[in-house]
Amino acid sequence: MASVHPTAIVEPGAQLGANVTIGAYAFVGADVTLGAGCVLHHHATVEGYTQLGPDCEVFPYAVIGGRTQDLKARPGKPGLKVGARNVFREYVSVHLGTQEGEWTILGDDNTLLAYSHIAHDCVIGSHLVISSHSAVAGHVHVGDHVNIGWNAGIHQFCRIGDHAMVAACSKCVQDVPPFVIADGNPCETKMINVVGLTRAGFTPDEVATAKTLHRLFYREGLNASQALEKARTLPEASGRIVQAFAGFAAATKRGLA
């Protein structure tokens, strides 16, 4: 059974899962679905056509499911789908998709720190940590196990690959490949995320392969097509590191940071 503070507003039509807790002065809109065990702290807002999976936590003054800021938005019912165990700290904002039938999507186990922002139509994987005051613009795709540092900005339509780290205060206007650390204004790939890969259970040989790819793409004077062709001839070409990196590079439309 849900526990709802008497000062909270839960509009008729909202669907509350088992053991949901809604604090003082929180707001839940009519089209919201809250999974079992979700916690909304005082003054938290979940609105719009929003679906939160189980055990999500929304801290004070966060607004989850707000209307997009995209000027192309038209009346309709775009949505937001959020997986399990996501944490939205104070003043976080996550917006709906732009058009009817379009969605902003977050996976599982993401942590969004205070004042961070996820814009319309983004597709976010799982295990993201986005630091305070950072912003991800519309239509950005972020992989799994990504870290985005304080006050970073990610341009519209960019992609960030799995296990990548974007350093604090970076401005990303191109795609950040998997497994790397990117930094700067504009953001550039600097090195392989060795600590992150090791913590994630990648083997020393796989980390070495990632370093080889970094040299191919960034240190040997090759253009992206040449580096990609050479990467596919490596002895490790069938392994998950080369497959992920090469596949990401081949699909880029904005170029690689």
List the model feature ranges, each with a label:
Residues 1-7, 12-13, 18-19, 55, ...:
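Terminal amphipathic alpha-helical/low-complexity segments used for targeting or macromolecular assembly
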Residues 2-183, 187-188:
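Structural signal for interior beta-strand "rungs" in well-ordered beta-sheet cores
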